[in-house]
Regions:
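Charged, terminal alpha-helix-loop-beta segments
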Residues: 1-210
Length: 210
């Protein structure tokens, strides 16, 4: 009957999508000191959790576009299109690195992607969350732009040898716990799941949801 309650059937988890980018372009990002992140078919280079370069596909093949976000990449290409790619990356990365360093003065560049900044610092210091090693992983849903606050996912091995998925977030997000569960389902349903937030955001509401 229409008024009967039935058990919900979960959908199949999303498959990981192969990211675009020729090996030499990925190597350029790495040699420029960027963290190379693969998410849902997109390959980007980040500094302290903020995208500063992206591999894009065009009529003439794959290339690296430099800049923070789509509009900045377009503007940077118009103004500095003749710069060698590595030099262009370094120019943008140096500016971003200055503003995203711990203790930096408030600036638009350190207000974007706070959750990814947190993930980047946990990856560089995994022992802070009881991990032996960590690497960035794709979220269960794709971000549509840099201003969209989507929890950042990482996976790795804990100090006691357990496969673990860690989801980082900043602020109070009532969808964080189900999001984290979906992230584990995507990467490893049998893994231990941890949620990392700043101390100020470890609210009782979040603990109750967990």
């Amino acid at each position: 009957e229409d008024d009967q309650v039935k058990e919900a059937t979960p959908a199949e988890p999303l498959a990981e999508t192969k990211s675009a980018g020729a090996a030499e372009l990925i190597a350029t990002l790495e040699e420029s000191g960027l963290d190379v992140i693969f998410e849902h078919g997109v390959t980007v280079g980040e500094v302290e959790g903020l995208e500063v370069a992206r591999i894009v596909s065009g009529e003439n093949g794959d290339r690296i576009d430099v800049g923070v976000g789509a509009h900045d990449r377009e503007a940077f290409g118009l103004l500095y299109g003749e710069l060698p790619t590595a030099q262009a990356i370094q120019q943008v990365a140096n500016v971003v690195r200055t503003h995203r360093a711990p203790g930096a003065e408030p600036h638009p560049l350190n207000r974007l992607g706070s959750e990814r900044w947190l993930r980047a610092h946990l990856i560089s210091q995994p022992e802070r969350v009881g991990m032996r090693r960590l690497s960035a992983a794709a979220p269960p849903i794709q971000r549509t732009n840099l201003k969209e606050a989507v929890p950042a996912v990482a996976k790795g091995v804990s100090l006691d040898g357990r496969d673990t998925v860690i989801v980082s977030a900043v602020g109070i997000d009532l969808d964080l716990v189900p999001f984290a569960a979906d992230a584990r389902l995507l990467h490893d349903p049998d893994a231990e799941l941890k949620i990392a937030v700043p101390q100020r955001d470890a609210h009782k509401i979040l603990k109750d949801l967990v």
